[in-house]
Amino acid sequence: MKISPNTISPSQSDPRMSTNVSQRSRVSGIGVPVSHSINNPSIQHVQDFATLSARSLRANVLLNSDDHSVPIHAKNPSELLEAIDNNISQTAQDWGVSIQEVEVILGSSKRIIEPVCGVTANTIMKLFLDNDIFSYSFEKGQSLSLSQLQERLASLPAHKNFILRVNDGGLGHAYVIDFPATTNPSRDAFLYQSDLGEGVTREVRFEDWMTQKASHPISLDDINTHFIGIAQDQIDLAHIAKLFDVDGNVKMLRADHLISHKTSEFNFQLFEYDLKNLENNMSIIKTHCN
């Protein structure tokens, strides 16, 4: 694997289990920052959800829910929280230990949980795509190879919106890229992610990424440069930092965590989305969680 630390170009694996916990659990008085981007109206909705899920237990359980058979807007946060409590109580009984000991391992319905990257990516996809007749599931999504994706990206209709979920084997990371409709000759994209900091890149909370970095556009060329570099083991750390580090700081990367990559280790799922559907899902979620 060849690594280039200084090439400058503009701005994380399948879902894994984790019990990393955030202490922020305020439910009321949520103030959502205004997006810095005027090119992408969907950013504000994802920011709203990230902020809500960082402060409301009811929204946080939606973020962490792994039941993909049910559309996100149809999930009942109270039922999900009750199911967690019942599972913890039953597990404590089965193991012969206290509820508190189980919560250390499995988490708690009474604390904000920051999910692994793959769970965040799946929930973002559901936020964009779920409706009354469709519920996104990563396991059932149609996957594209890198060459197939590049063909699709080269011919995306400019007047339509697209969302891309990426499993990036080189970084050991999953993330989502938003391609909003545009009237500009060049198409901007926007990256959404969370990261527990267990791989190449450092920890970043979903809310922090959405409020600090997500509204900074990246180009199709920048995205392709990263994909090709990973696939060919031509690693540009500065490019990775600019895309995936909240401050673009290459010194925060751990190059020793890079995985020697084969193209087949990428997993791409590309969908067209309707902005009104995203707006509707967020409106329902806010009603359920406020």
Swiss-Prot record:
Q: Which residues form the active site?
A: C117, H173, Q193
Q: Which GO terms describe its molecular function?
A: hydrolase activity; toxin activity
**Catalytic activities:** L-glutaminyl-[protein] + H2O = L-glutamyl-[protein] + NH4(+)
Query: Which of UniProt's keywords are assigned here?
Result: Host nucleus, Hydrolase, Secreted, Toxin, Virulence
Instruction: State the top-level EC class.
Output: hydrolase
Q: What GO terms in the biological process aspect are recorded for it?
A: symbiont-mediated perturbation of host cell cycle progression
Single GO cellular component term:
extracellular region
What outcome follows a substitution of G118T? Decreased interaction with host NEDD8
Query: Where found, per UniProt?
Result: Secreted; Host nucleus
Q: What is its EC number?
A: 3.5.1.44
Task: Map out region (Disordered) in residue numbers.
Answer: 1-26
- Report the superkingdom from the record: Bacteria
Pfam families cross-referenced by the UniProt entry: CIF
- What's the main place this protein lives? secreted
**Which family is this sequence assigned to?**
Belongs to the Cif family.
Q: What does this protein do?
A: Protein-glutamine deamidase effector that inhibits the host cell cycle and other key cellular processes such as the actin network and programmed-cell death. Acts by mediating the side chain deamidation of 'Gln-40' of host NEDD8, converting it to glutamate, thereby abolishing the activity of cullin-RING-based E3 ubiquitin-protein ligase complexes (CRL complexes). Inactivation of CRL complexes prevents ubiquitination and subsequent degradation of the cyclin-dependent kinase inhibitors CDKN1A/p21 and CDKN1B/p27, leading to G1 and G2 cell cycle arrests in host cells.
Q: What's the protein name?
A: Protein-glutamine deamidase Cif
User: What organism is the protein native to?
Assistant: Yersinia pseudotuberculosis serotype O:3 (strain YPIII)
Q: What is the lineage of its organism?
A: Bacteria, Pseudomonadati, Pseudomonadota, Gammaproteobacteria, Enterobacterales
What is the name of the gene encoding this protein? cif
